[in-house]
């Protein structure tokens, strides 16, 4: 039977303890456990050197040998095991030039970024913490807190992280300027933790971000974008964005020009409609950018360096949002025979997120205009218009892949069988018949063939555009 990630990590710790070494859970997993959250992964820190860790387990991978990191594999579950260490200078603003192994857990946690990430935890059911005789044990440390957990584990705190968690406070370990000089991305991580946890940032840490904000330009765009995606998909994204603005960090980010003018609207949108979908969150962030001045596809792919898939999904969502807001009443009118256009629009990458964005716009506008002092007739008109939009959005959300891309009832072979020569007329007829199908005006192959036959003569006589069975001219589609 497969074991859980925490069980695997605790088996690793027990094995290390049994061999005479100290071993603890460390970092974000301890923070999350203290907060009652489920960690995504579990990291172990130990007094054992990599060459002492490897013989204790059947399967290991040296994932970061130069940093003292070994991955232990138990029943298919990976646990990263890192030797206690202290870091040298960070010449590249990301990695230490040299790593020194340490003898104590206290030295190891003192190099980490924030106090909430500097906690240690023993395995469940353990009856003691560090050996009294071990160098750097709590008994010999100058300042520490030992706190039992309800499930029998013990939290060891050398940095005041437990108090900061209780006070919902993000604070650097040691001198914040030193921490940010080592790795400037830590400034953005502070904003991300504020967004994820709903915490505030200590005055000293906030002022250090303000003083050192320009250092973020040393960080690769890809790393910056990864943090931004985490911020906008967090429960308190508005807090993270507010911190970006108040510390001046936003002024040095590649997305500044697109989002700064409408940041307040983005914060309101993300506060009202929080999401865990990173593509939707990013679309919500840049939804307020001037469409006349912003190429969303270029912004995502070239400025933020997102993948083609994510760029298409985000830019597509914004395109669908605009299409729905501009044409909502038209799509709502059954006499307009426009459902085929709506279904084609819903083929756009990220379309469902586009519907969510448009719905947000309507609901936020309705909330803004819902104050007093409005004539009853105007209020009724506004509410009726909003209801039309919302009906269209509900319809879009109800569409299945088969509704949006039904199997074609007529093919090019059918047109050849009718005596047509392959050419641009094929595309016109095939698309026009599919439009009828999307509109629900043909449902069988026989009806589709009959419609194609009626179009044939008109299309062949035309110079490139023929009659649209839905009532409009059919443009040539390239």
Identify the residue ranges that each predicted region occupies.
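Catalytic cores of the polymerase beta-like nucleotidyltransferase superfamily
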Residues: 1-478
